[in-house]
Structures are given as C-alpha cells and as structure tokens.
Amino acid sequence: MEFAAQAFGILAFIVSVTSFQLKTYRQILWAQTLCATLFLTHFLLLYRCGQTDAMTGMALNGVCALRDVVLILTEKKRTQQMTRLLAVAFSLAVALVGILTWTSPVSLLFIIAMILNTVAMSIPEPNTVRVFIMISAPFAFAYDVFNHSIGGMINEAVSFLSALTAFLRYRRKGKETAA
C-alpha cells in the first residue's frame, strides 16, 4: 500500500506541474481539482499505512478540490468581491476542517499552507501570488516530510523554485522597464 500511496503522490505532482502549462484558467482549475483529488487519495493511503497526521492532508485536499470546483462553476459570474468572499469562506473551511482532523502540531503546518494558498487565489497580482506560494511551500514541505509524502515534497520544492524564479525574473523585468 505504501507504493500505491507514493505513486498517487507522484502522479499528483505531475498533474500539478502540467496544470500550469494549460491555456485557460478553467483548464488549470480542472487540472488542480484532479491534483487535489490525487493528493487526497495519496494522503488517505498514507493514513492507512499508519501516518496518522495524513488525515489532515487528505481532508484539506478535499476542501481544495471543492474550492476549485466552486471557482469553475462561478467563473463567468464571479466579481472581485465574490472572489474575496469565497477566499474567506474557504479559508474558514480549511481552518475548521483542519481543527476537526487535528492529530498533532504537525497538522498546523498544512493548515497554514492551505489557508495561504486559498488567500493567494483571491489576489489578481501574479507576483503577490508567487510570494504567497513561496511562503506556504515550506509549511507544506515540512508537513510532507513528517508524513513521508515523496510526491508532496517534490511538488512543494518545485513550486517554491518555480515561484522564486518567476518572481525574480518579472521583478527584474519591471525594474528594466522603469529605467
């Protein structure tokens, strides 16, 4: 079962990386929904292998999959205010579900990471989103280490490096344009 758990995690990482190569926001959200569902399965299997803190990862990935589906369904009629309200509602849902599945302080790492990611989705400025990703990735990475989530660790490391690279590249381009 450990092999299957890790396979789902690595598959989720591949879907995550691939999602950002897709053309439309809607396609990205569908891919992220699949990614969250694969990570949900990954953490469920890790939980069944004895990683008791993996329950929080499983549950919070379920909340994120639901969040992404809601964003897809409301995409055309969503205002900026509605996006903010959804971010607050899903941040509260992450906190509540995180508290309900709490098994140790390790759970707090993933709760923080997922709240930061949920807030990031409501910010239209790409470099600010990248900063939130860089802040949340170490929390999720540490959670993944404690739960032996190979796919999760790879995903967070690549996400952090990708966000950092883009942040520095676009920041530098902005300075060159201003000069």
Predicted regions and their residues:
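Alpha-helical membrane-protein topology signature
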Residues: 1-179
